[in-house]
């Protein structure tokens, strides 16, 4: 397929607008992708988004979007708890898929999607493609070459994302595109920082180090309710989870997702070895994130825009469809991270360390 890929944007909330519509409506990508459709169940939202960003068609139902012959692929920008069912429907409709994180809530759901997609020849890219960042590849190369010595331990995590979502520009306005209710971030299924943002940390950590083997955890809720425009949000999903991962060979990593208290830099891990350490993106005095670094498609105006990593992952899917180039932002890596999150909650609930049942193939040194 060499013509532009018709993209259907599933959900016109914060990530649908900032990650998909703003990027895919720019002139520099029209030779490769086109905005074929957008859907959202909120009255008037899909229509408003289509008018603002020049989308060919708009729907209030996902089924309507999937039935549109102009849609070749979907980018799923809906709440995480809907991803599995929407992915399944896309596969059944013969549409290629980009999943915003996380692809599913359980590893079993991910298994099912991977199997069904393979059977039907469907391409699936699953965000976040953190190993598309050049600095992460440099860090992995240091690890594989033994520059850090024997690995001792690592730490990564994030904090405060709940407050961030309450204050996004898409929550503070009065119209249909800027008054998007954030309740799902704090509720089951799919809410909480683990599925929402710790996933970035875990993709970095496992992309650099390879798959983990076991996990144990403690988890709970610090903030039981929030207020959105005078409306009370009752939270029923844990907002603070602390995990300990076992990578084998006595190498462990501490991973946190909490309401407050960041001890690391961004989503980057600190990795400590017997001969040296990578702290964030620095190896000693050497900065591993260079000024001209960018993901393959994040150039021109995209480089200065928010959610450029989401745009990159969508373009990875377009390249796969058009040129037959599979992406490192693959479903198998996403499944392993989901396995870690799911097993972490299970470990916290049972008080028992959980053995992970999934794996993936990390980048070999010759690909770095």
Regions found by a protein language model. Give the residues of each.
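Hydrophobic residues in well-ordered beta-strands that form the structural core
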Residues: 99, 124-126, 155, 255, ...
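Beta-loop-alpha module in the N-terminal Rossmann-like domain of NAD(P)-dependent dehydrogenases
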Residues: 53-116
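Rossmann-fold dehydrogenase core element
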Residues: 112-130, 148-154
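Contiguous beta-strand/loop segments that form the cofactor/metal-binding neighborhood of enzyme cores
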Residues: 173-174, 196-197, 201-285, 311-327, ...
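N-terminal Rossmann-like dinucleotide-binding module
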Residues: 1-53
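Predominantly a Rossmann-like dinucleotide-binding segment in NAD(P)-dependent oxidoreductases
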Residues: 130-233, 351
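C-terminal helix-rich "cap/oligomerization" subdomain common to oxidoreductases
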Residues: 1-4, 9, 73-75, 319-368
């Amino acid at each position: 397929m060499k013509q532009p890929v018709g993209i259907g944007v599933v959900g016109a909330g914060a990530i649908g607008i900032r990650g998909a519509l703003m990027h895919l409506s720019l002139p520099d990508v029209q030779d490769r992708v086109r905005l074929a459709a957008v859907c959202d169940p909120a009255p008037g939202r899909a229509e408003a988004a289509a008018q603002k960003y020049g989308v060919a068609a708009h729907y209030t139902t996902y089924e309507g979007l999937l039935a549109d012959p102009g849609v070749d692929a979907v980018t799923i920008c809906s709440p995480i708890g809907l991803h599995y069912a929407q992915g399944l429907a896309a596969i059944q409709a013969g549409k290629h898929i980009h999943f915003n994180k996380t692809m599913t809530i359980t590893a079993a759901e991910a298994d099912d999607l991977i199997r069904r997609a393979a059977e039907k020849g469907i391409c699936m890219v699953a965000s976040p493609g953190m190993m598309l960042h050049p600095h992460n590849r440099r860090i992995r190369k240091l690890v594989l070459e033994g520059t850090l010595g024997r690995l001792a331990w690592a730490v990564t995590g994030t904090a405060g994302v709940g407050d961030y979502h309450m204050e996004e520009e898409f929550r503070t306005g009065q119209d249909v595109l800027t008054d998007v209710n954030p309740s799902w971030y704090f509720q089951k299924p799919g809410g909480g920082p683990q599925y929402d943002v710790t996933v970035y940390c875990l993709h970095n950590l496992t992309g650099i180090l390879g798959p983990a083997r076991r996990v144990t955890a403690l988890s709970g809720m610090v903030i039981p309710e929030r207020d959105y425009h005078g409306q009370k949000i009752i939270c029923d999903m844990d907002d603070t989870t602390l995990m300990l991962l076992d990578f084998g060979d006595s190498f462990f990593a501490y991973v946190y997702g909490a309401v407050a208290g960041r001890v690391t830099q961004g989503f980057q891990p600190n990795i400590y070895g017997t001969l040296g350490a990578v702290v964030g993106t620095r190896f000693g005095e050497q900065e591993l994130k260079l000024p001209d670094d960018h993901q393959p498609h994040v150039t021109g105006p995209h480089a200065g825009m928010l959610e450029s990593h989401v745009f990159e992952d969508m373009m990875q899917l377009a390249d796969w469809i058009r040129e037959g180039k599979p992406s490192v932002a693959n479903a198998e890596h996403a499944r392993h991270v989901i396995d870690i999150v799911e097993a972490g909650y299970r470990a916290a609930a049972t008080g028992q360390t959980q053995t992970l049942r999934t794996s993936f193939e990390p980048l070999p040194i010759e690909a770095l």
